[in-house]
Amino acid sequence: MPPTKIFTSTKTRFMALIACVAIVAAACGSDVNTSSTATEPPPSPSNPKTITLVTHESFALSEDVLAAFTAETGITVELLTSGDAGTALNQSILSAGNPLGDVIFGIDNTLMSRALEANILDAYESPLLAEIPDEFKLDDTHRLLPVSVGDVCLNYDVGYFTDNGIAPPQSLGDLTDPALKGLLVVQNPATSSPGLAFLLASIAEFGFDGDYTWKSFWADLRANGVRVSPGWTEAYYGDFTWAGGGDRPIVVSYASSPPAEVFFAEPRPAAAPTAVVEASCFRQQEFVGILSGTNETAAAQMFVDFLLGVDAQNDIPWNMFVFPVNSLATPPPEFVEFSLIPDNPLSVPSVAIEASREGWIEDWTDIVVR
């Protein structure tokens, strides 16, 4: 008998090529910071400002798009990258009241409740929210505003499995097969947002009841030689056979990673060299917020508007390999062609993540790495 699932995956659809997901809105505290109104003239080419964006190392936009923003507003954006989104959030919480920057990007729906509970963000109801479907607006206090959406999934090296005559995994449960021993690398959920998303995917899939639970699954993965890397970059560009020349042909990455492998290849192949295990996918949204304590509130708000606007949104797919959320944006046809769009991505309600995330991570640590 299959194990009882505490959470079930829900059928989703794309609206205007954008994934729309129904996730319960995160519970929010009553103490909400409000961005102060600037008393000095707003930023402009004649009144230039510099702001710092705290983000993960995968943040990217085209130079010409950022340059156009600077030319129009007089705002220069400096990046302070902190590895993974989980690390960026941890550092921002530790520096509360004396923020490392002015704006933070990369907090996702798995980390949202933690960021809101820490009360490190100012509220800002951007006028650009009117162009974003309600499905993506998970924070009704407007401290975290939606920017992108994608799916965290198992990726595998197609050539490795073909050359070695091994069947690639088709489900999470397949990862415990002795035939796949020593082939998987994941990220630590304590420090990595895709790592946390994959942990939540296992909880959604295997649940807590019955003879086989999510804890059983991870115990079996440990016995089957799973490797744990600190973050996505180390796993994908270090351990993964295709991208990093490592010895692990299965990695936790994104549904949009295969089109990235096509886009950057010279010459471009007819088919992607990597593939996605659709049954493993967990829906992920990323958000932007203004850090409390910034001295550049007006400039920070203008940058948030820029990220939510069509110019930046159209630039997101081929730079960060996720889908935009603005309903007026148009993802490139080639990006859509090579991206797998899961029919039934796994999900865990935000309220459950908020209540149990730290305990789940602690249990995972006890099972997998201690």
Go through each PLM region and give its residues:
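Short, low-complexity disordered leader/linker segments with a strong preference
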Residues: 1-50
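Periplasmic solute-binding protein
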Residues: 109-120, 139-167, 195-205, 283-289
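A structural signal for short loop-to-beta-strand junctions that line the ligand-binding cleft
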Residues: 99-104, 122-158, 173, 182-189
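Extracellular/periplasmic bilobal clamshell ligand-binding domains
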Residues: 333-370
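Ligand-binding pocket segment of bilobal, Venus flytrap-like solute-binding proteins
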Residues: 194-279
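Early extracytoplasmic/lumenal segment of secretory-pathway proteins
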Residues: 28-29, 38-114, 370
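Mature extracytoplasmic/periplasmic domains
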Residues: 282, 291-347
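Short beta-strand->loop
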Residues: 121-130, 144-145, 173-176, 255, ...
